[in-house]
């Protein structure tokens, strides 16, 4: 639970460029995980959910910032 709070505070302090950079890295990792799964080489399947949730958290932070700039 503390890791989640740390991640949220880290996301709120990162710049938009850093968030997009991390988002692209996570998308590449997700692609590689899917590729490994297709080949049958994937050992840690729980990594899928962690990467997907991290992507969602970053997208949520970006949306929150975009909405706050509109008002």
From Swiss-Prot:
Secretion signal, residue range per the UniProt entry = none
Q: Which UniProt keywords apply?
A: Ribonucleoprotein, Ribosomal protein
State the GO CC annotations. Answer: cytosolic large ribosomal subunit
InterPro entries, alphabetized: Ribosomal_protein_uL29 (IPR050063), Ribosomal_uL29 (IPR001854), Ribosomal_uL29_CS (IPR018254), Ribosomal_uL29_sf (IPR036049)
For this protein, the record's SUPFAM superfamilies field holds: Ribosomal protein L29 (L29p)
Q: Which family does it belong to?
A: Belongs to the universal ribosomal protein uL29 family.
Q: What is this protein called?
A: Large ribosomal subunit protein uL29
